[in-house]
Design a protein with these regions (language model features):
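Glycine/Thr-rich phosphate-binding loops of Rossmann-like dinucleotide-binding domains
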Residues: 56-57, 78, 259
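Radical SAM enzyme [4Fe-4S]-AdoMet core and its adjacent flexible, acidic
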Residues: 42-45, 60, 66-67, 71-73, ...
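Conserved residues at the C-terminal ends of beta-strands
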Residues: 22, 71, 252
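Conserved alpha-helical substructure of the radical SAM core
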Residues: 1-58, 279, 286
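Flexible mid-to-C-terminal extensions adjoining Fe-S/redox cofactors in radical SAM and related proteins
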Residues: 194-198, 211-286
Length: 286
C-alpha cells in the first residue's frame, strides 16, 4: 500500500492529472477506495474500467470517479454468449447504478464477427439509457491470456471499414450515443492504414502494473520490465521508457489522444460527408 501511494505521489509530482484504472476487476482490489480518494484529493481525474458487478456495493468510491467505463458487446444474448450467462444484466445494473449516482457512464464495444449485426440495437439501448458507446475493432492482442480465439472473432479489414463508416455517418446525423471522436472514427474507417498514426506513448502517458513496472504502452507486450517505479523512483522509470510507436493502434481513446498530441487537426474535425456503405445481407446492421 505505501509503495503504491508513494509511486502515485511521485507521478503526480511529474504532472500526472488523469488516471484510467483497469484490471482484472479494479473494484476487488483491497486498497481501491483509498487509492481513488488519494488521487481525487490531488485533483487527478480518475476513470475506471469495470465489469459493473460490484458498482452497486461500491458507490462511495464510484461517486469520486470522473467516468465509469463498462464493456458491453451488444444485446443480452450477444453479450452473454461471449462473457457468460447473466453477465449482461450485471453489467447493465452496475452501469445504471453509476449513472443514477451522477457519474458519467461510457460503454465500450469491441466490434467483431459475433456482434457486428447488433451495433444499431446497442446504440438504441445506450441512447434510451443515457449512456454513450465507444467502438473499437477486435484484434488478436485483446485475447492474449484468455481461452478465446481472437482470430475467429475479428472482422476482415474491409468489414471493419464498412462498420465504422456507418458509425461515422450515424454521428454526422446527430446520434449522441456514438462517443468516438472524429479522429478514431476516421482512423478505423481507413483501418489498417499504410501510414502509422502519431504515438504519445512514453511521452505524455504510460502504463503502471500492480508490481510497479512502468510501460510506455499498455497495448503492447509487457514482458520487458526494466522500468520499475518502486526500485528506481517514478522520474527515473519514466525517463527511461522506450519511445517508439507501432504500425497501427486499435484502442479508440488512445488513437484520439495520439492524433491530438501529434497535432493532426485535420483528423479531428468532422468530415464533410460520409456515404454509408451497403452491407452484404449476412452483415446487415439491424
Amino acid at each position: 500500500r505505501a509503495e503504491i501511494l508513494t509511486a502515485l505521489s511521485q507521478l503526480h509530482d511529474l504532472g500526472m492529472r488523469h488516471v484510467s484504472v483497469d484490471g482484472g476487476e479494479p473494484l476487488t482490489h483491497k486498497h481501491v477506495d483509498e487509492i481513488t480518494a488519494f488521487l481525487v484529493q490531488r485533483q487527478v481525474r480518475v476513470y475506471m474500467n469495470t465489469n459493473g458487478i460490484l458498482v452497486p456495493r461500491k458507490l462511495a468510491t464510484i461517486r469520486l470517479l470522473s467516468k465509469v467505463k463498462i464493456s458491453l458487446d451488444g444485446p443480452a444474448a450477444c453479450h452473454d454468449a461471449v462473457r457468460g450467462e447473466g453477465s449482461w444484466r450485471k453489467a447493465v445494473v452496475g452501469a445504471l447504478a453509476a449513472r443514477d449516482a451522477g457519474v458519467p457512464v461510457e460503454l465500450t464495444c469491441v466490434v467483431g464477427r459475433r456482434n457486428v449485426g447488433q451495433i444499431e440495437e446497442l446504440l438504441a439501448f445506450a441512447d434510451h439509457a443515457r449512456f454513450s458507446v465507444v467502438f473499437q475493432p477486435a484484434r488478436n492482442s485483446l485475447f492474449v491470456g484468455s481461452a478465446r480465439d481472437g482470430g475467429a472473432f475479428q472482422l476482415e479489414a474491409a468489414e471493419v471499414r464498412r462498420v465504422f463508416r456507418r458509425l461515422e455517418a450515424a454521428k454526422l446525423r446527430g446520434c449522441a450515443a456514438v462517443a468516438n471522436r472524429w479522429s478514431s472514427l476516421r482512423h478505423f474507417r481507413d483501418f489498417p492504414r499504410d501510414v502509422p498514426p502519431p504515438c504519445a506513448a512514453g511521452f505524455i502517458n504510460a502504463t503502471l502494473d500492480p508490481e510497479g513496472n512502468l510501460f510506455h504502452c499498455g497495448q503492447l507486450s509487457r514482458l520487458g520490465r526494466s522500468a520499475n517505479v518502486v526500485a528506481m523512483g517514478a522520474r527515473a522509470a519514466f525517463e527511461g521508457l522506450a519511445r517508439h510507436g507501432c504500425s497501427q493502434c486499435w484502442c479508440a481513446r488512445v488513437v484520439e489522444e495520439n492524433y491530438a498530441w501529434g497535432g493532426r487537426v485535420h483528423r479531428m474535425l468532422p468530415p464533410l460527408g460520409v456515404a454509408e456503405p451497403t452491407l452484404r445481407a449476412s452483415r446487415r446492421l439491424k
